[in-house]
Swiss-Prot record:
Cellular component annotations (GO), alphabetically ordered: ribonucleoprotein complex; ribosome
Encoding gene per record: rplI
Protein name: Large ribosomal subunit protein bL9
Organism: Neisseria gonorrhoeae
Record lineage: Bacteria, Pseudomonadati, Pseudomonadota, Betaproteobacteria, Neisseriales
MF terms (GO), sorted A to Z: rRNA binding; structural constituent of ribosome
Alphabetized UniProt keyword annotations: Ribonucleoprotein, Ribosomal protein, RNA-binding, rRNA-binding
Length: 150
């Protein structure tokens, strides 16, 4: 299905690009989320009429994400969990735990923003983690996993 992107989507394209995606991806995710419209003549004309408004909105979203990136870059976030004698956790530190620690530090983040390429953190130590606030604004933070006092 041919669609017009209404915002920049990583791995797909930029605002205003006409791309071909699978029908289910367009119908079930992109169109209901307001990220795209079908590439019909009427929708193309409507998009061109609203292009400046959409570009301004995207610039505002990117500026907000970059401001949060400035606050977050280089920060150290501490997460405490029960650990055994050998320093391994009974459970693991997930992206939800890290997002909660970031929010506790006073910066807006959701678990979908936290990137853990090697999976959940299972041992005590310090880890470099990326927080993708926008496709063009990725902050690098240090997560210090410590053993909780019992």
């Amino acid at each position: 299905m041919q669609i017009i992107l209404l915002e920049k989507i990583g791995g797909l394209g930029n605002l205003g690009d006409i791309v071909t995606v699978k029908n289910g991806y367009a119908r079930n995710f992109l169109i209901p989320a307001g990220k795209a419209k079908r590439a019909t003549e009427a929708n193309m004309k409507e998009f061109e009429a609203r292009r400046a408004e959409l570009e301004a909105k995207q610039a505002e979203i990117l500026a907000d994400a970059r401001a949060r990136q400035e606050k977050l870059d280089g920060q150290t976030v501490t997460v405490a969990q029960k650990a055994g004698v050998d320093g391994r956790h009974n459970g693991s530190v997930t992206n939800a735990d890290i997002a909660a620690a970031i929010v506790a530090a006073g910066i807006e983040a959701v678990k979908a923003n936290v990137r853990l390429p090697n999976g959940p953190l299972k041992a005590v130590g310090e880890y470099e983690v990326e927080v993708a606030l926008h496709t063009d604004a990725v902050a690098k933070i240090t997560v210090a996993v410590i053993a909780a006092a019992e």
